[in-house]
Curated annotation (Swiss-Prot):
It comes from the Bacteria. HAMAP family: D_Ser_dehydrat. It comes from Salmonella agona (strain SL483). One of its GO terms (molecular function) is D-serine ammonia-lyase activity. This is D-serine dehydratase. The gene is dsdA. Belongs to the serine/threonine dehydratase family. DsdA subfamily. PANTHER family: D-SERINE DEHYDRATASE, THREONINE DEHYDRATASE, MITOCHONDRIAL-RELATED. The keyword Membrane does not apply. The lineage of its organism: Bacteria, Pseudomonadati, Pseudomonadota, Gammaproteobacteria, Enterobacterales.
Amino acid sequence: MENIQKLIARYPLVEDLVALKETTWFNPGATSLAQGLPYVGLTEQDVNAAHDRLARFAPYLAKAFPQTAAAGGMIESDVVAIPAMQKRLEKEYGQTIDGEMLLKKDSHLAISGSIKARGGIYEVLTHAEKLALEAGLLTTDDDYSVLLSPEFKQFFSQYSIAVGSTGNLGLSIGIMSACIGFKVTVHMSADARAWKKAKLRSHGVTVVEYEDDYGVAVEQGRKAAQSDPNCFFIDDENSRTLFLGYAVAGQRLKAQFAQQGRVVDASHPLFVYLPCGVGGGPGGVAFGLKLAFGDNVHCFFAEPTHSPCMLLGVYTGLHDAISVQDIGIDNLTAADGLAVGRASGFVGRAMERLLDGLYTLDDQTMYDMLGWLAQEEGIRLEPSALAGMAGPQRICAAAEYQQRHGFSQTQLGNATHLVWATGGGMVPEDEMEQYLAKGR
């Protein structure tokens, strides 16, 4: 406790985190893209290479997952305006939200119904390609739908994949790995929903369950993989490959906005609100957005009051050297995808200069907004996916932040507020009814 008091003396906001208060922190260390980019350790070329790899796999994905065929084997989500929800939020919070609110429906991505379909699937495909190229079974000029043949399934069945997850990452990696032909084991934390485990098992995935939180599941997955040279461990805490799979979203969104005739420039700023667990998904997406829109996009991470690992790590500068449990927070939240006590040190250090801020919200707020969105827009999400929905009203109320960035009333009126909906498209009906019943 004495250590917590010392920490609070240096970092006063920790007191609010410990008290589980809904907190907003605007990052005083935010820099321009030019200044912040070198610290990421990855470049636009890396993201372009990821884009090209996904294009090589498109013919395979279109055949393996017919639901992607219409999009030519591309796994991408719609971006939609939510004017009724915007009005509802203004009414509930008594706060005008200048500009227009949009929803990015990663919640309804093909194959696994969450943002993790981006990074998780990309890393499995990257590994499969590497093995097939090294074995001389494939060249990058081939039509990758040959990977569906029995010979390839046989080849991949010699190899296995392991991952630790609170649910959605396991779902995307499990489904994709099983489809390729890998043997796959998903190490699930106590937070993982029963339906996610059942769905994985239905695909022939081995699910190992733990009574502990996310960190333990990842550690056990890493250990199990070390003893088997043919087992590849997908490391949610440190993976650059996962990060790049998420980053592709930036260029894709830019293209979607261009199609819709939506302008993003200095006088039409873009604010993006990303739910954050360990950090890979929102970190990768934010990196991609920065490459696509430069200094005209402003990214915020959103976390549950019971799991504010990234806010704690970035705000104190301690990154993965501190966990929420170290300051007496239990890491128990209904937002199962965000129930992470220790943030990725890689993502925190890579992105700390490129984030405009982080905020927390409590479970009840997520449930309330889940209900409002279902009522107003007929869109149903899981609790984690509502974390971003609290962002626009916080930003519009933050006069000091607006002044620091020199936003005029005109700029704010022209702003786009994009809420990144991270999951919920595959939640079973009975489970969704339980969520809806908890909203006020």
